[in-house]
């Protein structure tokens, strides 16, 4: 294992998460992550405004269907990224930089293969996916055109997500914010130009919006990769280290075995969202557009939970790797307090201002605005409960306990959320769908609290495969899909 002299000095934005005051360190790490979430949400929301204002309600409904599919795709690989991030964090806690780079290399090789398969298979099966979603006939052509371009945009998006998560695993949440800002600016600037056309640029309609995402993803990924090498960050690969991109069997097994349950958690959320949008689509285009607009608000409500959860996970992983179990429970408690204050404040603010904000997405359609306002009133507050589950799950996953959170989520999203919505929709109509959200969040929170207190998750060791591999080498490292955004890791 490399000694202290092999460990690069911390770069700008990189933090040692195993020392210092917990609350201050957690906040300092979480704020850039929260900034990334804000940029993602603003990016998706502003683009939804462009689409809604320039192309109308049908186009907005089309992107609502397509964006859920995009979230499903990200979910399919996100678990591997989460497993890699935890391995990187634990190895950073041990100050083993070579192990960090081995994990990153294996992950890059895996993500590159998945990216190529996604483009080819996704383009072919896009029509079938939209039919399964019961996409309204008047929306289908727009959704198909948009979705196929989004499939092409996914490889750069996948790799950007991996690098962003890896950087956070090393304790650097500032660098991802910088390049999230770059991608967001490019996407937002190109959307109106490519949708409506300008000068020699032809009007591409909804395909132009998807093309803007493709260009923004590519620019952001290329710039981030160049920056990593220019600053010689811990996750860069040079010389003989480039062979790490060829997946190592032991590391790949660890990433896949631990990553599949974590990816399945997002797939459960995504599958639930697909099922819910299928129920929503039965109520017509106006309700689908209203639901899509409410989802835009929910991206903002989720931001504190996502940011604090990512910070808690990174801090817990490094402290577990360093053997600092005395700090892990304190990190969790600090995360819960921070999350409750921030999420509760946002819920209150958006409840007061929702009608004004919804107008941006739905224009003068009073019917859709009324439906969206009711959706937000019934379901919006449930994200306070969601935040509690997010923080507790982030801590237990940091030690490799991944099956328990998966089973809890499956129960909350399946029998509870979808089951209640499906059972009561014939009785009380669309309100059954909206009430199922707080029911599912409450079930998830209660079960997660019980698991955190009594689940035995502290006995897990996600880094076992990585640690054993590293030693051998030295002998001869839960959100609702909404908007057009990538998970923040």
Could you tell me what each predicted segment is?
Residues 1-30, 88-155, 201-260, 316-382, ...:
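Short alpha-helical transmembrane segments in multi-pass integral membrane proteins
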Residues 17-55, 68-83, 87, 112-119, ...:
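N-terminal transmembrane alpha-helices
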Residues 28-47, 149, 183, 216-220, ...:
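Transmembrane helical elements of multi-pass membrane transporters/channels
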Residues 35, 47-51, 63, 88-93, ...:
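Hydrophobic/aromatic residues within transmembrane alpha-helices of membrane transport systems
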Residues 42-61, 130-137, 193-204, 263, ...:
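Helix-terminus/linker motif at the lipid-water interface of multi-pass membrane proteins
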Residues 60-120, 157-176, 290-354, 386-409:
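Small-residue-rich hydrophobic transmembrane alpha-helices
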Residues 81, 85, 149-168, 176-184, ...:
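Short runs within selected transmembrane alpha-helices of multi-pass transporters and secretion channels
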Residues 122, 165, 191, 195, ...:
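Structural signal for membrane-spanning alpha-helices in multi-pass inner-membrane proteins
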């Amino acid at each position: 294992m490399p000694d202290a002299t092999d460990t690069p000095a911390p770069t700008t934005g990189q933090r040692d998460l195993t020392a210092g005051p917990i609350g201050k360190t957690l906040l300092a790490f979480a704020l850039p992550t929260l900034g990334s979430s804000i940029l993602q949400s603003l990016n998706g929301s502003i683009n939804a405004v462009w689409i809604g204002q320039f192309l109308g309600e049908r186009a907005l409904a089309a992107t609502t269907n397509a964006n859920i599919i995009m979230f499903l795709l990200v979910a399919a690989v996100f678990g591997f990224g989460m497993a890699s991030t935890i391995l990187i964090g634990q190895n950073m806690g041990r100050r083993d930089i070579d192990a960090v780079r081995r994990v990153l290399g294996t992950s890059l090789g895996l993500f590159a293969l998945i990216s190529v398969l996604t483009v080819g298979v996704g383009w072919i099966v896009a029509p079938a996916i939209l039919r399964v979603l019961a996409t309204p006939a008047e929306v289908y052509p727009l959704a198909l055109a948009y979705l196929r371009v989004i499939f092409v945009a996914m490889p750069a998006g996948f790799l950007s997500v991996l690098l962003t998560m890896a950087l956070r695993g090393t304790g650097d949440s500032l660098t991802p914010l910088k390049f999230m800002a770059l991608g967001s600016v490019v996407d937002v600037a190109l959307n109106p130009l490519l949708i409506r056309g300008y000068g020699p640029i032809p009007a591409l309609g909804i395909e132009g919006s998807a093309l803007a995402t493709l260009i923004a993803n590519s620019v952001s990924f290329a710039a981030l990769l160049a920056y990593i090498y220019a600053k010689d960050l811990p996750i860069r690969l040079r010389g003989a280290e480039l062979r790490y991109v060829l997946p190592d069997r032991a590391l790949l097994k660890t990433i896949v075995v631990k990553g599949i349950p974590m990816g399945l958690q997002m797939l459960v959320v995504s599958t639930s969202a697909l099922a819910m949008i299928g129920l929503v689509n039965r109520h017509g285009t106006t309700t689908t557009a209203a639901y899509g607009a409410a989802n835009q608000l929910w991206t903002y409500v989720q931001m504190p939970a996502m940011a604090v959860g990512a910070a808690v996970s990174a801090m817990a992983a490094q402290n577990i790797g360093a053997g600092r179990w005395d700090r892990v429970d304190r990190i969790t408690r600090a995360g819960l307090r921070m999350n409750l204050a921030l999420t509760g404040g946002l819920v209150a603010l958006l409840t007061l201002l929702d009608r004004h904000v919804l107008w941006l997405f739905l224009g003068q359609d009073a019917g859709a605005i009324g439906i969206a306002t009711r959706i937000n009133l019934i379901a919006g507050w449930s994200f306070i409960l969601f935040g509690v589950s997010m923080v507790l799950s982030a801590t237990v996953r940091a030690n490799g306990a991944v099956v328990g959170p998966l089973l809890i989520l499956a129960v909350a999203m399946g029998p509870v959320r979808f089951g209640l919505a499906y059972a009561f929709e014939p009785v009380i109509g669309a309100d059954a769908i909206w009430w199922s959200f707080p029911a599912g969040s409450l079930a998830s929170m209660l079960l997660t609290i019980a698991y955190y207190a009594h689940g035995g998750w502290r006995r897990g060791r996600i880094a076992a495969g990585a640690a054993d591999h590293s030693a051998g080498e030295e002998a001869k490292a839960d959100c609702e899909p909404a908007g057009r955004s990538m998970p923040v890791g």
